Amino acid sequence: MHWSESLLKDVSGDQRISTGISPSGPIHIGNMREILTGDIIYKEALKLGIKASFIYLCDDMDPLRKVYPFLPGSYERYVGHPLSMIPAPDGDKTYSEYFLEPFKETIDKIDVRPEIISTTSLYKNGVLSRAIDIAMNNREKIKNILNSIGNYKITGDWYPYEPVCKSCGRINTTTVISYNYPYAEYKCKCGYTGKADIRTDDGKMPWRVEWPAKWFSLHVTIEPFGKDHGAAGGSYDTGKAIASDIFNINPPLPLLYERIFLKGKGVMHSSTGVVIPASEMIKFSPPEIIRFLIAKNNPGRHIDFDPGPGLLNLIDEYEKYERAYFGLDSVKDDDYKEVYELSRLKILKEPEKITFRHIVTLVQIYNNNDALLSALKRSGYEKDYIDDYIMNEIDTARYWLEKYAPPEMKFSLTDENINLNDDERKIVNEFLENIDNIEWSPDSIHNYVYDIIGRSKMRPQDAFAVFYKILIGRSRGPRLGYFIYNLGREYIIKRFSSILAETF
C-alpha cells in the first residue's frame, strides 16, 4: 500500500490538506517535499472517492529575520518587518511576491495547483480574528501550554499577539500591554505606543499559536510538515494542546517528512545559500521527475539529491517504472503503479520510446533539429516532426549538459588520428569486416562488439577504450551500442576505415 493511501485509510468525511512556507528566500527543491507530499495526498484522496481540498499557505506576515547572503546590505533596515510589507529585491511588488511568483509558475508546470492563500490576507480580511480573540482571552492557558510542553520560559503579563509598529514597521519589537476587543494596545522598543486592530493585518500571532489558529479557522484536517516541528515539545505538540484545549478542535492528521539533502553540500536552506531553486529543477529535469522523487520515497526517509550523474540514474529509474507500468519491465516495488500514476502529469497510452539518457547523447552528436529528428526516428520515434514533449526533453538535456553534467559525461566527436597497436588494429579491423552484415540496432551492435572482444587478447575495458578514443578522443563515453547506432553505419565505416588507413 502506497504511503498516501496508508495515511488515508481510516479518515472519514471531507478533508482539507494544508501545506505552507515562509517566503524568506528562494523556494527550493528542499521545500518541494512539503507541497508535493500534500499534492500526492490530495490526488490520492480524490482517487479514493474522498471529497478533498488542498491549500498552500504563504506565511508572508513572518518578519525578515536577518540580511541573508543573497540580499544587499541595505535590507538591514527591513529586518523585523513583515515579508509582505518589504519591497522586492528588484523593486517590483513585495519581497514575498518576489520569491513566491516563480514558485507558483513552477508548481503549475508539475501539475500542483493548490489554493494559495496569503497569511497577510487572512489577517487583513479578518479570517483569523475570532481565533485571535479566543487566544487573547485564554492567554494564561496558552502560556502554561507553551511553558509546560514547549519548555518555554514565558513570564509576566503576556499576550499571544505581535502588533506591527506603526512607527518603525517592525513586528518583532512590540509588546502588547492591554487588550479590549478588537484593539490591542502595545509599546515598541523604538519608543512608540499605539493600538492594533486584530481584525486587520495590524499584527499576527506567534507561530506556535498561529498554526493551531489556522487549523481552527481554515478547518484543516491533514497536514504534512518537517520532522523538526514534530519533535518532542515541538510546535506540533504545543499546537495539538492549543487546538484541543483552547479552540476545542481535533488537530489535523500529521505526516512528518524528512529533509532533502543536496549531495556533497548538506541540507538545502535559503538562509545558507545551499539551494537549487525549484524553478531551476524543471529546466534541467523532465517535470515528472521531481514528482517521482517524492512519490516513490516514504516521507520518513531522507533524500540525497544529486543534480549531476545521480539525476540520470533517477530518470533511468523513473523510465523503468514506466515500462513496468505497461508490462514491459519489472521493479522491486509493490506500489510501482501508484508511484507512476502519481508522478505523471498525464497518463500515457504507451511508454515513451526515447529515453532521456539517449537524448543526452543525441544532442551532443547533432547540432540541428533535422539531424536530431532523423536520429530519433532511427531510435523508434514515429512522428515526422519533433513534438512538444520531445522538444522539452531536448532543451532540458542541453541545459543539464551545460549546467550540471560532470566533464566525463560531455563529449564531442573527433576526427583526429590515433595510433593503434597490433591488438587494437585487429579488433578495429574485425569490427569493420562484418559491419555490413549485422542488424543495425543497439543490442546487435553491443553483442557484436562483445563477441569480437571475447576472441581477442585484450581486457574488455581496454578494448572498449579503443572504440571511444577513435570516436571522441578519450577512453570512456556513452553506452557503446547506442552510441555507434546513432552515429550511423556510414559514419562508423568512414571513421574507422580512415584510422586503419592512417595507422597501416
Swiss-Prot record:
It is an enzyme of class 6 (ligase). The keyword Ubl conjugation does not apply. One of its GO terms (biological process) is lysyl-tRNA aminoacylation. One of its GO terms (cellular component) is cytoplasm. Its main location: cytoplasm. It catalyses: tRNA(Lys) + L-lysine + ATP = L-lysyl-tRNA(Lys) + AMP + diphosphate. It is found in: Cytoplasm. Pfam families: tRNA-synt_1f. A motif ('HIGH' region) lies at residues 23-31. GO terms for molecular function: ATP binding; lysine-tRNA ligase activity; tRNA binding. Gene3D superfamilies: 1.10.10.350, 1.10.10.770, HUPs. Its EC number is 6.1.1.6. Keywords: Aminoacyl-tRNA synthetase, ATP-binding, Cytoplasm, Ligase, Nucleotide-binding, Protein biosynthesis. Belongs to the class-I aminoacyl-tRNA synthetase family. This is Lysine--tRNA ligase.
